[in-house]
């Protein structure tokens, strides 16, 4: 896959970058990435993936832009209030990089449709705001052997990890699943919604950009991805911490008793 002269100029800072270079930029151009959610995390994530030259971006979101979204969902603007988020995101991506193909999925990802959606892409990034979607996405990515970058934000805190449970580590042990990290969703109502607890707008930008970095890393293959590691960010005290987590042999996806 060749580059036009405009693409060479556009991606020049990647092409000269050790770890990406021309081969890595070609991988980005060939890549298909599914982004779940065009909200607080999905907005900066889409911006950086489009700018990086990912060849195809799919976005799953069935919501419309609300005025209260604009404090953090920076891909949308005031004129977009009331508009479908996938439509607003499509315009923003095209404005940023017209070389990127955009596919909007006007629906909510769930256990019934997740595998079909995931199967059409190479990498998945989940920026959803509920556990039902997170479990559905992580299960589907396991079954379809797709890397999953998953992030979450609270009021002043955020977390990020990368899941590749269809592969094994250097010791020959399966990589952990999302269910190894969170075996069960929290009780209903125990985690307040963003509208109740609030969220620091800039925090979603920080984590969304870090999610984009993990996606680019997964495509290009450089560095040490967050597989088996949970990155925690405390924005109140501006502290970062990384916690290791292991494969749980009792997990239902790739545990010892899981169906083969």
Please place each PLM-identified region on the residue numbering.
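Adenine nucleotide-associated cytosolic modules
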Residues: 1-260
